[in-house]
């Protein structure tokens, strides 16, 4: 009997503890997970970074449907798997008039400029650093009124355009924009065609934030930023009808709803 009890206790101590996740599996969500260090984590067969402390993070794109399958693989190739159904959302329609026509239907020369700028933005958002700044949570970059919501279908001068994949804060020109978390500056540009004055901060593991239409940029590329540090000032540069801050969140190329990550 004593042998059986000892054997049972040994078995219990060797049970594989399943990974844990924090967050609702819904379009636009950023999900943080915890697993035993040394394992491998896969999201829908894509291997993602697992920190030395067993932390992982992934995002769900605005239009992603179906399931999220999370697999944890140990050194003996034993797999623990869980499947989650993605909750779909209904998005609003937003009409914006009064834009200069070149900002709605750019000419060929402008399209070439836009492509180069979009490549710079994409490259900055695909960085997979070891930072874990995202773990501290995110505060709002300014206290302005939200004038544009995530996921809304944009109708610009009566013409359907891409969804709005961030949120807009209406605020007076010159309002200070503060970093919502510690970060590393991967892009700081004064005059992009659509986004105007633009900053991208890397928060680690593919999580990044973008700040657009800035009147002033107060940081430099490759600079480490502290949470609450002033990084720029609100403007109306690029494609904008008035002063506001466009704030976006990415997990690599997945667009995350900023309102789901605050605090």
Where are these regions (language model features)?
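Short peripheral tails and domain-boundary helices/loops at the edges of structured domains
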Residues: 251-263
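Short, well-structured beta-strand-loop connectors
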Residues: 176-187, 219-234
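Surface-exposed, glycine-biased beta-strand/turn segments
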Residues: 83-195
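Zn2+-dependent peptidoglycan hydrolase active-site motif and core
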Residues: 180-215, 243, 248
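Cationic-aromatic interfacial patches
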Residues: 17-90
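Cleavable N-terminal signal peptides
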Residues: 5-6, 15-16, 151
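Short hydrophobic beta/alpha edge segments that flank linear recognition/processing sites
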Residues: 169, 198-199, 226-238
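Sec-dependent N-terminal signal peptides
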Residues: 3-12, 70
């Amino acid at each position: 009997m004593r042998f059986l009890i000892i054997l049972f206790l040994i078995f219990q101590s060797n049970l594989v503890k399943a990974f844990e996740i924090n967050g609702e599996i819904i379009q636009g969500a950023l999900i943080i997970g915890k697993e035993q260090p040394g394992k491998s984590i896969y999201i829908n067969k894509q291997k993602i970074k697992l920190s030395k402390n067993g932390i992982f993070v992934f995002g769900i794109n605005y239009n992603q449907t179906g399931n999220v399958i999370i697999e944890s693989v140990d050194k003996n190739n034993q797999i623990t798997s869980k499947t989650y159904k993605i909750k779909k959302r209904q998005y609003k329609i937003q009409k914006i008039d009064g834009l200069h026509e070149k900002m709605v239907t750019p000419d060929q020369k402008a399209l070439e400029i836009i492509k180069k700028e979009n490549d710079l933005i994409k490259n900055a958002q695909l960085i997979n650093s070891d930072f874990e700044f995202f773990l501290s949570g995110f505060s709002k970059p300014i206290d302005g009124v939200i004038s544009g919501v995530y996921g809304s279908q944009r109708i610009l001068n009566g013409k359907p355009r891409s969804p709005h994949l961030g949120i807009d804060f209406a605020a007076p020109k010159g309002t200070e924009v503060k970093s919502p978390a510690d970060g590393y500056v991967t892009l700081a540009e004064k005059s992009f065609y659509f986004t105007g004055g633009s900053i991208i901060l890397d928060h680690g593991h593919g999580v990044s934030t973008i700040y657009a239409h800035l009147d002033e940029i107060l940081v430099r590329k490759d600079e480490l930023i502290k949470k609450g540090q002033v990084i720029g000032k609100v403007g109306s540069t690029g494609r904008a009808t008035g002063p506001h801050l466009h704030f976006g969140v990415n997990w690599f190329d997945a667009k995350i709803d900023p309102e789901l990550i605050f605090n």
